[in-house]
Amino acid sequence: MDDVTPDELEAVSVLLRLPNPVFFDQEEEEEDEEEEYDEESVCEDDLEVKSCMQTNENKGKKRKVAEQLMDSDVKDNQYRLMLGKEPVKKMMDALGKTEKLGTKGLNVSVYGPNGENHKMVLKIWIKGTPVLTSGWKNFVKSYKLEKHVDFLTIWMFRHKKTREICFAIDSTRFPVKGTLSKRILQEVFKNP
């Protein structure tokens, strides 16, 4: 570990002491009854977060994406969250039939750390980079997210009732002064 900075060592020691995020499975059969619900106040019983994080070749292993927020993710003139191509592709494949994003993108619900629903748009840029836009700025402000110190854990799933693609994002703040190396992030978070 000769090429690791003191900041990275400190961050790794803090990150490795964290418990794994809690995942929950919904194994109950859906009932055929029609019921109305308020999309703004959806409880976790209405969300289906089971095999959405699995890839076909890794059945049983839940998937999440963890990212350190960068300057461009919170910058006033940009305000979009860039997501990794491969992890998002694996999660989309695991969700089965996928909607076409088209040039306008796909409207998605993003549930924040407090369970609040934020409307955003998932787009794929020209080089294939997935981004969350149109609402990301408010999300950043709502949770007072900052570059480098905030790390996001992102889950992707289908809503149990609407079957629409949704995201759940949790944030954890660490005493980090700069960007951690990709190698350290991959080791700590074990991104797919």
From Swiss-Prot:
SUPFAM superfamilies: DNA-binding pseudobarrel domain. Residues 22-44 are annotated as: Disordered. It is found in: Nucleus. Residues 75-173 bind DNA. One of its GO terms (molecular function) is DNA binding. The keyword Transcription regulation applies. InterPro entries: At2g31720-like, B3_DNA-bd, DNA-bd_pseudobarrel_sf. Residues 25-44 have a biased composition (Acidic residues). It comes from the Eukaryota. Keywords: DNA-binding, Nucleus, Transcription, Transcription regulation. GO terms for cellular component: nucleus. PANTHER family: B3 DOMAIN PLANT PROTEIN-RELATED, TF-B3 DOMAIN-CONTAINING PROTEIN. This is Putative B3 domain-containing protein At4g03160.
